[in-house]
Structure formats: C-alpha cells, structure tokens
Amino acid sequence: MKTRFFLFSILMGIGLGITLQIAFSYYFLYIEQSQLFLLTTDYAWGLWREAGGFALWLSELVVQYFAYPHVGAWLMAGLITLSAIGSGFLLYRLSHSRVLAYWGWLPACALLCASLDFNYNYQGIMAYLLFLFFAIIYISVRDFYFRIGIGVLSLLALLGSSGTVYALFALFAWIYEISRKEGRRKWVAALMPLVALMLGYYLYLDCWTETLGGAFSPRMYYHPKLDPKGVIYYAWGAFLVLSVIGGILVRRENPDKGKRVWIGETISALLLIGAGAWGICTYGDWKSLRFMELDYYSRTGQWTKIEENCEGKLTNYLYMFLLARALSEEEKLATDLFRYNFRDEKALAIPWNKSENISTLLSDLYFTCGNTALAQRMAFEGNMGARGKNNARLIQRLIQTNLIFGEYIVAEKYIRLMEKSPVYHNWAKSQRVFLQDDKAVEQDPVLGVRRALLPPDSVEVMASGTELIPALSVPVLANPEKAKVAFEYLAAYYLLSRDMNSFIALLNSYKDEVSWLAELPVIYQEGVLVAFENRPEKWKEYALNPDIVNSYVDFRKQVLANRGNSGLPGLLRRTYGDTYWFYLMFSK
C-alpha cells in the first residue's frame, strides 16, 4: 500500500474525531458511567476466564476514559481508524489492489454505526481489532502447514480472548487460502471452518450463547436481553464480501499502477466519506442525545445549563424531570416553576421500571429531596442491573448514602472498590475523611443536610414504597425547617396535578412552622387565589400580595372579555404566561 491510503485514513480519522466531538460528545460521557473498570488482577482474571473476556477487559479499560470531556470522541475515532487501516491492509494483501485497500473503511464505518447504539458493547470493537491482529500474523506465515497450525491456534486464542469473532477469522483464513490457488492445499484450509463449527457447537452446549447461530455471529456483543439491530452484523458481512471480491474476483499477482488507480482511489474515498456520513445520520441515536447532554449537566451539577437548554416548548418528560431537579437544587422550583413548559405532574415523577437508567434518575431525585433511604435503594437496584460489573455513578451514591446513615463499614467497602478505578480513585480517596467522623459528615454541605433529614424510623420503613408523595413526605415530616426542597416538590406536584385540597392542606400544615414560608412564594399565592376564588375572606389568612390579587382580577376580566377568541392563549401569554392561572386554563 502506498502513502496515499495512510494519509487518507489519518485525515478520515481526524474528520471523524471532529464529527464525533461535535455531535456525540455527551453520548460518550453517558455510556462511560455504566461500567466501573477496576485495575486489579482479580478483576482482570474474573473477566479473562470467560469467553471473550480479554476483549471485554480491553473495552472497559478504554471506555473508562470517556469520563473525561473530549476524550471519548477521539478515542473512538482512533479505534475506528485503526480497524480501517488493519482491514485495508488485509484486503490489499488479498488482492494487491490499492483501490480495494480503501474499502477497509467500509467495515470500520459499520463498526462505528453499531457503536452508536447504547446497547452495543464496545467489546465487539476490541474483538474485531484482535481478529485483525491474528489475521495479519496468519497471512505473514509463508509455510502452508505451519500457517494452518497457527490458524487453528489463533481460533482457540480468539475464542478465549474475544468470543465469537473466531468465526470471522475461520472464514477469512479459508478465503485467503482459496485465493492463493495452490491446488488441493486450499481444501486442507477447510479445516479452519470445521474447527470453528465444533467450537461454536461447544459454546452453544456450554450455554455461552442462547442460540446456535449466536455462537457464530456478533450477537454476543449486544445487550443479551434485547433484540439486536441489523447494523451489528454489517462489519463482518462487509469484510467477508470484500475479502471474496479481493481474493477471488480481482486478485492480481502484482500491485496495480497507473492513472486508473488514482481515479479509483478518488472515487472510493468520496464514496466512503458519503457512506460514513450516511451511516452516522442513519444509526446515530439522535433522539437521546439531548437527554444525555442534560443528564451530564445534572451529574456534574451544572444546573443553569439545564435551564438554558430547556427554554421554550418541552415534549419529553425526561427533560422536564431533569429541569425540575435543576430548579430544586437552586431552590427555584417555588419561584420559576411556571416559567417553563411543565405539562403536568408526570414531569416530577417518572415511573420506576427497575432499569439502570431510571433507577439512576430516581436515586438523584430522592437524594436531592432528602429521602436518603430511597436514594440508596434506587442506587442499589440500578447497580444490580448495570451493563458492566458496577455503575460508577451509583457506587458514588452508595458511598454517600452510607456515610449519611453512619454505616461507615459499608461505605468503606464501596470506597475500597472505587479506589481501584484509575478514573475515580481520587474521588473515592477524598471520601475517607468522613469515615468514623460524625462531625465531618454533619458539617459537609452535601451530606450534613441530608443526615439532618433522617427520620427516627428504621431503614426498612424509610425505604418502603416508591410513590413520590409518601417518599417526599418522609424528610418533610422528619425536619420541616430543613426539608425545603422536598416541600417545594410536593407543592409543585399538587399544583401541577390541580389537587388544590392537598396543596392547601400542605400549606396549612407548615406555613406557621417554617421560616421560609413567612411570605408565600408568588405561585403559592396564585394557587391560594384559585383555591379560594369565591372566598376572599380567606385571602388575608395567607397574607396575599394585593398586586397578585389585582393581577388575578385583570386576568379573569380579559378571559371573560375574549371568550371564544382562538387567539386568547397568545394574547395572554406575554403578560400571564408564567402564572399558575395561565397553566390551569391553557395547559393540556
């Protein structure tokens, strides 16, 4: 191969890195948290002794660094570029065609498209790279029988280290031997597919795969409980088709030369760039990218960025859920609730489906609101369902919640676990200052306030139930003065659900007990006006601001004056769009 192919690959890799950084930077930050890599011999051996374990270990080793901004996109671009160069080298050795070498980017692009599916395991990319490594060694051996021996050993090595990619190696080796046109020897090479068949049957019988077909395909590298998309098969299929074309149909004894090569390379490069762009546009999980961005801001405490990204119309309850938490963390839920497009009470309480992702979100919510027991339970449940051995984000939460409860032995167990992670070692080490030190916990701005919200009941009682109202009532009942966030969540839930009786009951229970309700927030006063619209004598009891009362009177007058006017919502939005009255009348 000439320098042009390597130059094209480097430029393609740079372009890919820029594209991934611009479009998918938060995707890589999101997928990292679902697997906590531990740099220990026990952890490595636990993975290596399983079929495909070494490739899985390598993938987790790489993916852990996705936790750093900008790193994930460039690491992925590097892996895809490496796979393209390796594929191109093998195709060139098969065909002696410089043009066909460029098409090594086709299976590489297919790998990229597969990796943009959250449920695809990057073990598949590492397995493909290991296949290329063994395939290059295989074709470098000149002696036929020695090469066949190396091939059989490579099959066994790939099965143990990389999983089902051994089947791809067996077919490639057979195609390679057929392409050499060495008479009867090529039929001896059929030994490779036969050995692969026996290995696959063994995998199936030993329950490594659920189906016999899965023992010979990349199905192994997809979430075991979900049906894979067809794109996960494209890389293998493309490489085998190109191998047949290069090794059997267009094979040359000498490298191609001349002007036609330049033309072929140029056309191939343009087609491959187009194919890559089409693949990214088609298979990228574009619908989830905004959520992943908001989730990253939530995880890192960048609350104002969540607010900025949620201006205007919202249609996704997950966005609303994250926005509500951001407002709560900034103590703005009681002031800015109706400045944003919350559709109804479902925006505050997504149902728990026992999945890793939803458990993580609910753990964050309950931690914010001060129900530490439920935050811990959701973290534990989510971690049990993690794609990897552990979820880094949820292990952090388990450390925090056990410190709050004073369960220092359990907290230290999780700290020791996380200290074995190269990425999270420093954070875990910083938590040791709280071990066996109640004063340090109580003085910490994150842990201390949540310890103050612990009720006197047992952990089992606190952890029972996952409904929002009883869950948020726990910290409010335990310490009303410090449970402002939980109180505001409850009040917001009642207002959004139009449950005025519960809203008034909540206010009556605490308005004379806590200092921060000495003057009711504007939206609470608006709610009181709605609840006691026909009982103005009640208004004085809640010390309603006369300006708010006058605004409500004007709102009613304009509504009555424009009855039947289809443009009424637009007419009133500018003046009353952030009021509870506007929400009641025009939200659907």
For the regions a protein language model found, what residue spans apply to each?
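Start-transfer (signal-anchor) and selected internal transmembrane alpha helices
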Residues: 1-17, 261-270
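Membrane-embedded helix bundles of polyisoprenyl
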Residues: 11-20, 101-117, 122-136, 150-169
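Membrane-interfacial interhelical loops
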Residues: 27-65, 110-118, 201-233
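Transmembrane-helix motifs of polytopic, lipid-linked glycan transferases
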Residues: 77-95, 109-110, 132-137
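Transmembrane helices and adjacent periplasmic/lumenal helix-loop junctions
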Residues: 119-122, 140-182, 197-207
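Cytosolic-side transmembrane helix boundary signature
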Residues: 221, 227-268
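Internal/C-terminal transmembrane anchor helices
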Residues: 258-285
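Soluble catalytic regions of membrane-associated enzymes that act on cell-envelope
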Residues: 278-462, 475-500, 506
